[in-house]
Regions:
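Basic, glycine/lysine-rich polyanion-binding surfaces/domains
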Residues: 1-187
Length: 187
């Protein structure tokens, strides 16, 4: 499961991100996400997070593990890139499966056009009255969404209660990360 969000923000955010990933960061539009790979100097894989481009000058590396935040800070130890690199207080909840679209519509209303949201598309929304980033993504291999709650340590209960309440009519099942689903989906 995704547990950590490492933010790269500043005037050189795109340039720095492009330097550390194997994909072309300049081709990732704001409010889109992509699967990316970070390699060491020999080409060995360090991590393979989902990268969210929140704005022109802000990226989130969405990680399940590792110290990529420290690695990124080390890459920029000489401050040649004008960026801030930090772990932010944003935590995701996944809504996955064939009922995910209907549940999400009940949860956030018509504030986001979920019917036309592309895979790896992002949108700003509120859940339980709290600021979130929504992505159409997940590792279940089925339709799904991830809700990234901002200021999660303060507002997790508000978001969680809203998700559980909206999920009642959809027979929401709360489960822990199912890593076998990711393997079955070829992710």
């Amino acid at each position: 499961a995704v547990e950590r969000q490492i933010r790269v923000k500043g005037p050189d955010a795109e340039k720095f991100t492009d330097y550390v990933i194997t994909r072309d960061a300049t081709k990732i539009s704001p409010m889109r996400a992509r699967y990316v790979i970070l390699c060491n100097y020999k080409g060995g894989v360090l991590n393979d997070p989902i990268l969210l481009r929140i704005s022109e000058d802000e990226f989130w590396f969405s990680l399940s593990d590792s110290d990529i935040g420290l690695y990124l800070q080390g890459v920029n130890a000489d401050k040649r890139f004008n960026v801030e690199i930090d772990e932010i207080d944003a935590c995701p909840v996944q809504i996955q499966g064939p009922k995910s679209l209907a549940l999400m519509k009940d949860l956030i209303g018509d504030h986001v056009d979920l019917d036309n949201m592309p895979f790896y598309g992002l949108a700003e929304a509120t859940v339980g009255g709290r600021s979130c980033v929504i992505s159409q993504s997940g590792f279940s291999g089925e339709a799904g969404y991830e809700i990234y709650l901002r200021d999660a340590t303060k507002y997790a209960d508000d978001m969680w209660n809203a998700v559980v309440e909206a999920g009642k009519k959809h027979s929401l099942m709360v489960i822990a990360p199912a890593h076998h689903r990711r393997i079955q989906a070829g992710i």
